[in-house]
């Protein structure tokens, strides 16, 4: 098994790694694909908290301080299940406000 496949920063508390959301605001997506107008779909990692906000992150950056940037709120909808093995380099992190 590839050790890089299931890497999750320990600061992220997994509630359910099998949840996926669809980003419906393309300007907030990490991947800037101007040729594709359809919504990008990224697996998400849930963090414990009553209120939720979205931020984008790259899992392959070295430090937690460098890995994330805040985005404006993103309109999302639940889609099909995804496992942590399917996480791309860019994924959505849901954090408590």
Curated annotation (Swiss-Prot):
Its main location: host cell. The keyword Membrane applies. Residues 8-97 form the 9b domain. GO terms for cellular component: host cell cytoplasmic vesicle membrane; membrane. It is a peripheral membrane protein. It is found in: Host cytoplasmic vesicle membrane; Host cytoplasm. Transmembrane segments: none annotated. InterPro entries: Protein_9b_Betacoronavirus (IPR018542), Protein_9b_SARS (IPR037223). Keywords: Host cytoplasm, Host cytoplasmic vesicle, Host membrane, Membrane. The gene encoding this protein is included within the N gene (alternative ORF). Bat coronavirus HKU3 is highly similar to SARS-CoV (SARS-like). Belongs to the coronavirus group 2 protein 9b family. Homodimer. This is Protein 9b. It comes from Bat coronavirus HKU3.
């Amino acid at each position: 098994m590839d050790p890089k496949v299931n890497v999750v920063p320990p600061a992220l508390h997994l509630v359910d790694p099998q949840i996926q959301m669809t980003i419906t605001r393309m300007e907030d997506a990490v991947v800037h694909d101007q040729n594709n107008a359809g919504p990008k779909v990224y697996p998400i990692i849930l963090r414990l908290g009553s209120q939720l906000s979205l931020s984008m992150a790259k899992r392959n950056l070295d430090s937690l301080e460098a890995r994330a940037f805040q985005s404006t709120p993103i309109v999302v909808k639940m889609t099909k299940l995804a496992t942590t093995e399917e996480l791309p380099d860019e994924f959505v992190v849901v954090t408590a406000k």
